[in-house]
Amino acid sequence: MLRPPITIVETVRFLKDADRLISELDRAELINFVAANPEAGELIPETGGVRKIRWALPGRGKSGGARVVYYYHNESLPVFLLAAYGKNEKANLSRAERNAMAKLVPALIQNYSEGSRRR
């Protein structure tokens, strides 16, 4: 049975990164893909469950494309698109970035859950 797509939340950081890396059309395709396949990205160690997906860019393919960092908890929360970067910019998140993501994840869960209960 097909499940409905997951809601996507684009963070300010992701939007800034995406604006310089990904066209509007490619961003829409990315969002549709992640919404339908929220577990597609590989888990990044030491981040509390943050994932990274390789996204092909026109003329560059997956290996020269963008890396999109996102968090998916479960179907009760949206997918949070956190950041994006070109493979030519860096290979992986730094330890400081991984630590920041690990601190961000519980805050996302708590803040979103509290906001949902208030409605």
Predicted feature residues:
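Arg/Lys-rich, positively charged N-terminal/basic patches that mediate binding to nucleic acids
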Residues: 1-25, 118-119
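Enriched for short, Lys/Arg-rich terminal
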Residues: 4, 72-119
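A generic structural signal for short beta-strands and their flanking turns/coil linkers
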Residues: 10, 30, 47-51
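Compact soluble domain cores
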Residues: 13, 22-42
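Residues that form generic nucleotide/phosphate-binding pockets
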Residues: 17, 33, 104-108
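Amphipathic alpha-helical transducer elements in NTP-driven molecular machines
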Residues: 24-27, 63, 98, 102
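Basic/aromatic recognition patch in beta-strand/loop cores that engages polyanionic ligands
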Residues: 40-85, 89
